[in-house]
């Protein structure tokens, strides 16, 4: 069960990172450095990541109290498609958009 606690701790760390990313995104949006469509798209990706990590935590807690199995956790994690807005390519696109707006 120690590994389940480690998974919970790690996921909560990433939930905090998602919240920080959301704050940074809101800040650059409020400064007028990205448009509304880009902001909404990136915000949805961050929220999706945050919800994914929270789902993993919920499954882990259910495993600890005996309501779920590790197989459910394995299947959930196995089927995750990572679509982070923080990938290098997408981050470069945001920076390019900011630079274009400054011209």
Map each language-model feature to its residues.
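Short intrinsically disordered terminal tails
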Residues: 1-2, 47, 100-103
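Short amphipathic alpha-helical heptad-repeat segments
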Residues: 3-7, 11-22, 50
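Secreted/luminal cysteine- and crosslink-motif detector
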Residues: 12, 19, 40, 61-63
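Flexible coil/linker segments and helix-coil junctions enriched in charged and small residues
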Residues: 25-47
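Intrinsic disorder/low-complexity segments enriched in small, polar and charged residues
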Residues: 27-30, 75, 103
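Acidic, low-complexity, intrinsically disordered interaction modules
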Residues: 38, 45-83, 88
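Short, leucine/isoleucine-rich alpha-helical interaction segments at C-terminal helix-coil junctions
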Residues: 80, 97-101
